[in-house]
């Protein structure tokens, strides 16, 4: 079978589970599959256009070899002369016609350091196997900066992933608010909202909202904050100006925002003609 006739397939859940078992806690699941993990965790439907074909991990050169050995895959290394975050790629044949890619990265695109991603990552479990996955807010920032800074991501796939990441972060903030660990601590929720606010006010946040109509501010939820007078009168009005009309309407219906005042048509004054 010639190389040119083979096609890249979407990684199946069974194969992904095998990959995650091999990944362990040495690597961190990032990118589109990290987004898919959180969408599944919060029971959010993933649009077909948002599905990622491959799996990306933050890791080391040794991790490339671990994946290749565990999956009986072929290692494809990046040219060292090229400046690329890709340390290596493992190509796994799933049939004579199809293959999938497992990419191991030194860093992710955008203004997020490897150190910060590692420190904020979550440990997750499938069966008896534990692996690490990128923090939901890091996922959102990654999707935003991808659409903003990578031309190939400025398509339906990239935009749908950003929309999905916004939904995921909303679910995450609500879950944090109801958690026994963080729910009683309003400063934890404010910290998350502060980070979303920085994204929405960034050059990426503003330009993506203008060009694609996708508003990062829509990721905000305000559990326990909307009734706080200082927050409601000072910060909330500023945040709302960066939201989509649909999200503003949702918040009005939920009584988080005041209802739109009814507009009345001005009374037409009778004209006076001179006799």
Describe each region flagged by the PLM.
Residues 1-275:
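Compositionally biased terminal segments of proteins
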């Amino acid at each position: 079978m010639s190389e040119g006739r083979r096609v890249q397939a979407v990684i199946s859940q069974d194969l992904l589970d095998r990959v995650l078992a091999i990944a362990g806690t040495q690597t961190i699941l990032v990118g589109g599959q990290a987004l898919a993990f959180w969408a599944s965790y919060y029971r959010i439907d993933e649009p077909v256009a948002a599905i990622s074909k491959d799996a990306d991990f933050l890791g080391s050169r040794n991790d490339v070899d671990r994946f290749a050995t565990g999956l009986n895959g072929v290692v494809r290394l990046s040219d060292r002369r090229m400046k690329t975050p890709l340390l290596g790629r493992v190509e796994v044949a799933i049939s004579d016609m199809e293959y999938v890619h497992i990419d191991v990265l030194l860093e992710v695109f955008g203004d997020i350091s490897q150190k910060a991603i590692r420190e904020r990552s979550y440990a997750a479990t499938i069966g008896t196997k534990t692996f690490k996955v990128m923090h939901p807010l890091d996922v959102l920032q990654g999707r935003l900066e991808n659409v903003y800074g990578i031309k190939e991501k400025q398509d339906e796939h990239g935009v749908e992933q950003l929309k999905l990441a916004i939904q995921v972060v909303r679910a995450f903030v609500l879950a944090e608010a109801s958690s026994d660990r963080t729910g009683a601590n309003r400063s934890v929720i404010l910290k998350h909202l502060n980070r979303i606010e920085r994204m929405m006010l960034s050059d990426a946040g503003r330009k993506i909202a203008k060009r694609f109509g996708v508003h990062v501010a829509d990721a905000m939820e305000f559990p326990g904050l909307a009734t706080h007078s200082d927050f409601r009168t000072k910060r909330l009005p500023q945040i709302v100006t960066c939201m989509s009309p649909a999200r503003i309407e949702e918040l009005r219906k939920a009584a988080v925002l005041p209802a739109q005042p009814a507009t009345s048509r001005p009374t037409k004054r009778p004209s006076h003609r001179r006799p």
